[in-house]
């Protein structure tokens, strides 16, 4: 090989190398997938205070908004100074195990200022200032994976989509009024505070509504703002001045007024009297302009043309003050006469032409009964607080507090920005209340809409919807808690001696802590994390919900809200959403999307400058994107980055257009920016129908982690990113060398980022057989060996469902698409026995069982091995403390933890009394309440945890667990200490070498040179006694010595803290003395009834597991693993599964070829054919691994990885085409049709025609038949109806419903029916008799009255009807008819 060794690079075998089919280069880095959660909460907490103090956001803003708090008399004020967090008491793992909340104590520094008030002048002087830190409860912290640990369970706070604050203009689409007239409305939505609606009614009168109460005319609202009638008219209308001339009136000519108007009468020049345009002519804009150029300044109109106009000002007699006519009056014959009589030669008319300017506000003013500001304020007060008599002060205060008081009304920065944008205002985003000009602006804009100018808003546009992430939700919740606290503080300030108290005495932090606890514990958005597999975790954290407090409800949400909107492109995934009632209300963030500081979702685009596509990336929200022309990521570019086509397909303002290339100013960064994480994991997504893709992305989240995970042959390149960001696979925090590895931990000696304050050792604890929230198994396996060099970010351990750092949700299996004896009818799946024998789809599930010993009234419960009436055989798995051993194989009914509960004293029989008198105290009366394995569960005990209350003596088992834990901690400490020693002494030896010493340990000659032999003569601990003559080096040695001592102390301190925590008792719920948790691992092999699926929405239930020899086989004798129905493909239009099958077939074929070449190399030592094959397979480009630079050893490692099948990546919308698949099939020496001759396993005959065969990636879903199938013999009954309970969890029965009863009636099966409705259900006496009869071996029984009949009678009696049951004949005899006497 011509390559030099310097060029060679190593392959460590710890990552999967994929051949990339994508043609489009990746220009933007994909943001961290859980950044949404982490960034938001970090911004809220701001744990580390930045220099110059914290900015006003998050927690800081909450405290600033509530404090300072003054008492009612103004003599004292409580100010907020700052807050700080202490270290959390327990780390994440400890909180998980002890059922605690992972939280840090919040300490708030408050300042109490007491004033002296001068009674005469009212001036204040500061009398006293006290500052104090006050504990304000615990604040939950987010783990590094973006989750919260609340009471020991992992929870996720889902982000909420809601309508952005701001102003929205809309209409009712003609639905409100029978005439179908479109009624416009505007709504001002604040972040918190009252909503303001301004709307038209069917008569075109404009009304205002506050908080959806009764409507009032908008002019009343404007009057309440301090305007009068003439202000209102002059604000909304222009004036035209009419001057009286001899034959009519003269008005100025304006182009705007006449352009586009059809003339009703001749247009006469006022100066010359000539007609410049005849009646009936339509003036275009150009003609109207020409008239001005010809010198037309004013025109003359007749008196008739004034009729129907409106006066702009009052007509007043200035001497007497008498008002002849009011502003807004309509001019009719009467008014003209008045004008003539009073000699008005010049009047102002409102410029209303009923075409482009309507008289809506003027008409509203005329309808409005309120004349003054006071009337208007009273009217608003009565609407808001009906039944209370208003005074001017209360009405004014109430109106002010509605929209203009920052404590009650907050538009928020977002609301102000949106309002500015929509209405073209320029107001800083610190002004968060409404201003008079805002309200006037909204009314003006609404009137313009009615006049046909402007556009209404689309409320489903993502520019009008924003995301509230964790931080913001938490901020709102905490504000509620603080406001509750504020009231209590004010009251307490008034009731105590303010001079003597400290801030601590005024504050009761319970309301704030309760608000936090309530939010995390019971809010609709705080959800139990879906932890089935790493993908389901990540998806849950990236979820956007429109439901929840302040959001929509399922019932009210219409079709529009749920539908995909053009602005979703690159922001919200159009595919991934649940099926069912939540469809479209719960969405997923797209892969590249991020949320900006205002809460709007942004998507990245490449900038285009001078027609050249650059690699500069900008993030834009939906509003900002609307004005750009955006090309798709797959538009073809030349080598310089210019578009090759003259016309390019692009998006603009929600439309898809073809535009000239020089118009385009942005381009998508990647084809997968359109979809979410789950959808981007589906290869050939572009060949699947959207409905099936939806099912595919949803079902990947339900895949159970298997014992042996295997990455897909056909991936999309997203697998590694998901595994890394989900935290399932462990990546190295910093570079170093592996020092120790075992199954439970990896110890790495750091070689970079060696900060003296940090330890030079990284210990990574692996999770072994831990239970997830969904009872799947979390197990991590190391990938590194001792001595390996590690770079920062390398994957060092695989987790659940990951394989060499790639997400691996299922297995690659050999599939044949063909019907087989009806066993794949209706999507059923036929499996080979090999799948079961080789544990291909075997998963481990961990069940948790918990038992608590409480202090009861009759005495304490006890956990013990000494259980009454239980055979020794049943106790075989218990230790002396009565707790099951680890490793015990348990089955239904086995005792896991022995427990006895005191029983009430029962009266003694004479015999018992005698025995008691002879033998003394009898064994106390206890009953067996041991915890047993539930029916249908077999497994192995993998872990036992024992928790004791403070002060309760620990049993042997608890002590043993404690000893093991302390030994583990000591081992960690010792390993870290030994690495620290090695590092420090190596550095010390390097400093001392070849230096002459002025002092040394005993027996050392002064001035001697120090070399390795000298050092080896003394134990290492004595090396510190050397002192060298070089002062600089000596100072370094002393610094190293100090640092070493500090590190040792810190290590010992950490160890002692942890030991103390282990030895300390546990916090328990009230009444619980001791608690035991037993974890049982259940191994679930695949079996008929389990649900399986591919990644393309192709799901089915296993119908039969066939012996290997009966499965169809290939010419070389390989049997198919799975047989699927070909009819499942055409109607469902998910052709992606067929393409995946072909490509998987090619991957396996190629793997086989590479395997043969590896064998050839091992026999002959000739690596050239292998190198050529791999280099041809994985060409050199920026997406592929540089295999040309691998040395021979690395190449063979890679070839071994590829033996089973070559891994490839076909990114969504940029993947392999049919030609690529054909080429790869031919390269692997396979038929390009992808079909082969199959032979029947039972007869050995070939099937009639060729069959599509290949490798498909199948998942086993978390719908296992073991969890669902269930049978009841005798079990619990409902208390009232005495009918058996329902459901597996309650060990219930099967419901025999109304229609089933009809079926038995139709058969005439009277006795069967009677049995069903009585003894098998709620006939208490009857079922007891049946039981006794069966025990006797008898089969006769008699039914009596069912309990539900008694319930009915009781119900009737409660209504006052006394129903009695008796014999009908007796009843009739008592009611004998009286004789009829004839007269």
UniProtKB/Swiss-Prot annotation:
It catalyses: RNA(n) + a ribonucleoside 5'-triphosphate = RNA(n+1) + diphosphate. GO terms for biological process: DNA-templated transcription. The gene is rpoB. DNA-dependent RNA polymerase catalyzes the transcription of DNA into RNA using the four ribonucleoside triphosphates as substrates. Gene3D superfamilies: 2.40.50.100, 2.40.50.150, 3.90.1100.10, DNA-directed RNA polymerase, beta subunit, external 1 domain, DNA-directed RNA polymerase, subunit 2, domain 6, RNA polymerase alpha subunit dimerisation domain. Keywords: DNA-directed RNA polymerase, Nucleotidyltransferase, Transcription, Transferase. GO terms for cellular component: DNA-directed RNA polymerase complex. The RNAP catalytic core consists of 2 alpha, 1 beta, 1 beta' and 1 omega subunit. When a sigma factor is associated with the core the holoenzyme is formed, which can initiate transcription. It comes from Bartonella bacilliformis (strain ATCC 35685 / KC583 / Herrer 020/F12,63). It comes from the Bacteria. PANTHER family: DNA-DIRECTED RNA POLYMERASE I SUBUNIT 2. GO terms for molecular function: DNA binding; DNA-directed RNA polymerase activity; ribonucleoside binding. InterPro entries: DNA-dir_RNA_pol_bsu_ext_1_sf, DNA-dir_RNA_pol_bsu_external_1, DNA-dir_RNA_pol_su2, DNA-dir_RNAP_su2_dom, DNA-dir_RNAP_su2_hyb_sf, RNA_pol_bsu_bac, RNA_pol_bsu_CS, RNA_pol_bsu_protrusion. This is DNA-directed RNA polymerase subunit beta. CDD domains: RNA_pol_B_RPB2. Belongs to the RNA polymerase beta chain family. Its EC number is 2.7.7.6.
């Amino acid at each position: 090989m011509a390559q030099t060794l310097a060029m060679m690079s190593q392959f460590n075998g710890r990552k999967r190398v994929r051949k990339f089919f994508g043609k489009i280069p990746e220009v933007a880095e994909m943001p961290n997938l859980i950044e949404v959660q982490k960034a938001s909460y970090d911004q809220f907490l701001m744990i580390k205070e930045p220099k110059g103090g914290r900015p006003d956001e998050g927690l800081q803003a909450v405290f600033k908004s509530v404090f300072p708090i003054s008492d009612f008399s103004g003599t004292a004020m409580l100010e907020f100074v700052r807050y700080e967090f202490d270290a959390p008491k327990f780390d994440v793992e400890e909180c998980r195990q002890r059922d605690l909340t992972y939280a840090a104590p919040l300490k708030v520094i408050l300042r109490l200022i007491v004033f002296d008030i001068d009674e005469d002048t009212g001036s204040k002087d500061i009398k006293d200032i006290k500052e104090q830190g006050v504990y304000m409860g615990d604040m939950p912290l987010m783990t590094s994976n973006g989750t919260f640990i609340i009471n020991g369970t992992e929870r996720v706070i889902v982000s909420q989509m809601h309508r952005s604050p701001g102003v929205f203009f809309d209409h009712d689409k003609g639905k409100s009024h029978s005439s179908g007239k479109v009624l416009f409305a505007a709504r001002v939505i604040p972040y918190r505070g009252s909503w303001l609606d301004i709307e038209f009614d069917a008569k075109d009168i404009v009304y205002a509504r506050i908080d959806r109460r009764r409507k009032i005319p908008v002019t009343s609202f404007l009057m309440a703002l301090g305007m009068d009638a003439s202000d209102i008219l002059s604000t909304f209308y222009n004036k035209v001045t009419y001057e009286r001339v001899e034959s009519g009136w003269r008005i100025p000519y304006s182009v705007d007024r006449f352009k586009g108007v059809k003339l009703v009468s001749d247009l006469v020049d006022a100066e010359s009297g000539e007609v410049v345009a005849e009646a009936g002519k339509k003036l275009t804009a150009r003609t109207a302009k020409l008239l001005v150029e010809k010198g037309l300044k004013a025109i003359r109109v007749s008196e008739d043309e004034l009729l129907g106009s409106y006066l702009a000002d009052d007509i007043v007699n200035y001497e007497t003050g008498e008002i002849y006519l009011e502003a807004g009056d309509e001019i009719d014959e009467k008014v003209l006469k008045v004008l003539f009589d009073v000699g008005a030669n010049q009047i102002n008319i409102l410029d209303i032409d009923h075409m482009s300017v309507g008289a809506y506000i003027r008409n509203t003013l005329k309808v409005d009964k309120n004349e003054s500001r006071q009337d208007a304020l009273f009217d608003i007060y009565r609407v808001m607080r009906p039944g209370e008599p208003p005074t001017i002060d209360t009405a004014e205060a109430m109106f002010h507090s509605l929209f203009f008081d920052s404590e009650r009304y907050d538009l928020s920065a977002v609301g102000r920005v949106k309002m500015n944008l929509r209405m073209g205002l320029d107001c800083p985003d610190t002004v968060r209340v409404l201003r008079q000009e805002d309200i006037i602006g909204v009314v003006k804009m609404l009137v313009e809409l009615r006049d046909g100018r402007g556009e209404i808003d689309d409320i489903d546009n993502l520019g009008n919807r924003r995301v509230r992430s964790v931080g913001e939700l938490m901020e709102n919740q905490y504000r509620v808690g603080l406001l509750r606290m504020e009231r209590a503080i004010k009251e307490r300030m008034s009731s105590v001696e303010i001079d003597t108290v400290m801030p601590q005495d005024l504050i009761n932090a319970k309301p704030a802590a309760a608000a936090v606890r309530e939010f995390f514990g019971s809010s609709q958005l705080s959800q139990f994390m879906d932890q089935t597999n790493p993908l389901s975790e990540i998806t849950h954290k990236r979820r956007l919900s429109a439901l929840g407090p302040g959001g929509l409800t399922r019932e009210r949400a219409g079709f529009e809200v749920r539908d995909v909107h053009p602005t979703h492109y690159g922001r919200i995934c159009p595919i991934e959403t649940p099926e069912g009632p939540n469809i479209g209300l719960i969405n997923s963030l797209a892969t590249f999307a991020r949320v900006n500081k205002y809460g709007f979702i942004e998507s990245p685009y490449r900038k285009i400058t001078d027609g050249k596509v650059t690699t500069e990336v900008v993030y834009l929200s939906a509003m900002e994107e609307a004005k750009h022309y955006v090309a798709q990521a797959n538009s073809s570019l030349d080598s310089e980055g210019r578009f090759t086509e003259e016309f390019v397909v692009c998006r603009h303002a929600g439309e898809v257009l073809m535009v000239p290339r020089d118009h385009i100013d942005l381009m998508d960064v990647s084809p997968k920016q359109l979809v979410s994480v789950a959808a981007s994991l589906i290869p050939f997504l572009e060949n699947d129908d959207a409905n099936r893709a939806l099912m595919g992305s949803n079902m990947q989240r339900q895949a159970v982690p298997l014992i042996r995970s295997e990455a897909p042959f056909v991936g999309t390149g997203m697998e590694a990113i998901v595994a890394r960001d989900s935290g399932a696979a462990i990546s190295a925090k910093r570079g170093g060398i592996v020092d120790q590895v075992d199954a439970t931990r990896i110890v790495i000696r750091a070689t970079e980022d060696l900060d003296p304050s940090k330890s030079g050792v990284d210990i990574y604890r692996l999770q072994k057989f831990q239970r997830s929230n969904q009872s799947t198994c979390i197990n991590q396996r190391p990938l590194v060996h001792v001595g390996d060099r590690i770079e920062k970010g390398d994957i060092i351990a695989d987790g659940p469902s990951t394989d060499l750092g790639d997400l691996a949700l299922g297995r690659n299996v050999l599939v044949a698409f063909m019907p087989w004896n009806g066993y794949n009818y209706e999507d059923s799946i036929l499996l080979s026995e090999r799948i079961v024998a080789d544990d291909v789809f075997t998963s481990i599930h961990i069940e948790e069982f918990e038992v608590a010993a409480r202090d009861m009234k009759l005495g304490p419960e006890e956990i013990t091995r000494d259980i009454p009436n239980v055979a020794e055989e049943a106790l075989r798995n218990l230790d002396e403390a009565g707790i099951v051993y680890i490793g015990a194989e348990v089955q239904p009914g086995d005792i896991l933890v022995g427990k006895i509960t005191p029983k009430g004293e029962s009266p003694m029989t004479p015999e018992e009394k005698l025995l008691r008198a002879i033998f003394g105290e009898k064994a106390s009366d206890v009953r067996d309440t041991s915890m047993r394995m539930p029916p249908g569960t077999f497994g192995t005990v993998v872990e036992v945890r024992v928790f004791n209350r403070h002060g309760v003596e620990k049993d042997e088992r608890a002590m043993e667990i404690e000893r093991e834990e302390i030994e583990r901690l000591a081992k960690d400490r010792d390993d870290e200490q030994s690495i620290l020693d090695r590092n420090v002494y190596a550095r010390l030896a390097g400093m001392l070498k070849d230096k002459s010493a002025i002092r040394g340990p005993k027996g050392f000659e002064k001035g001697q040179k120090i070399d390795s032999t000298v050092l080896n003569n003394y134990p290492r601990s004595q090396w510190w006694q050397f002192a060298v003559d070089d002062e600089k080096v000596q100072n370094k040695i002393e610094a190293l010595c100090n640092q070493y001592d500090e590190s040792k102390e810190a290590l010992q301190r950490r160890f002692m803290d942890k030991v103390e925590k282990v030895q300390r008792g546990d916090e328990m719920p009230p009444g619980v003395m001791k608690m035991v948790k037993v974890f049982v691992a259940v191994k679930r092999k695949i079996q008929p009834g389990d649900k399986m699926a591919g990644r393309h929405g192709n799901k089915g239930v296993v119908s039969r597991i066939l012996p290997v020899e009966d499965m169809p086989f290939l010419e070389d004798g390989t049997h198919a693993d799975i047989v699927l129905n070909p009819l499942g493909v055409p109607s469902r239009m998910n052709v992606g599964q067929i393409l995946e099958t072909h490509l998987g077939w090619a991957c396996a074929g190629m793997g086989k070829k590479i395997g043969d070449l590896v064998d050839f190399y091992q026999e002959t030592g000739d690596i050239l054919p292998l190198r050529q094959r791999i280099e041809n397979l994985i060409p050199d480009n920026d997406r592929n691994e540089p295999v040309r630079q691998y040395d021979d050893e690395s190449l063979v490692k890679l070839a071994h990885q590829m033996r089973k099948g070559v891994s490839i990546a076909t990114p969504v919308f940029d993947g392999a085409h049919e030609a690529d698949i054909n080429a790869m099939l031919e390269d692997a020496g396979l038929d390009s049709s992808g079909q082969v001759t199959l032979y029947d396993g039972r007869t050995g005959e070939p099937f009639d025609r060729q069959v599509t065969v290949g490798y498909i990636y199948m998942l086993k879903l978390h719908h296992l038949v073991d969890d669902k199938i269930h049978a009841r013999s005798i079990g619990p009954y409902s208390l009232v109806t005495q009918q058996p309970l329902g459901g597996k969890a309650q060990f219930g029965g099967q419901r025999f419903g109304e229609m089933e009863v009809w079926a038995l009636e139709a058969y005439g099966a009277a006795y069967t029916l009677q049995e069903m409705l009585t003894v098998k259900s709620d006939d208490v006496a009857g079922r007891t008799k049946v039981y006794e009869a069966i025990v006797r071996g008898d089969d006769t029984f008699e039914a009596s009255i069912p309990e539900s009949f008694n319930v009915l009678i009781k119900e009737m009696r409660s209504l006052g009807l006394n129903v009695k049951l008796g014999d009908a004949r007796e009843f009739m005899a008592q009611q004998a008819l009286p004789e009829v006497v004839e007269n």
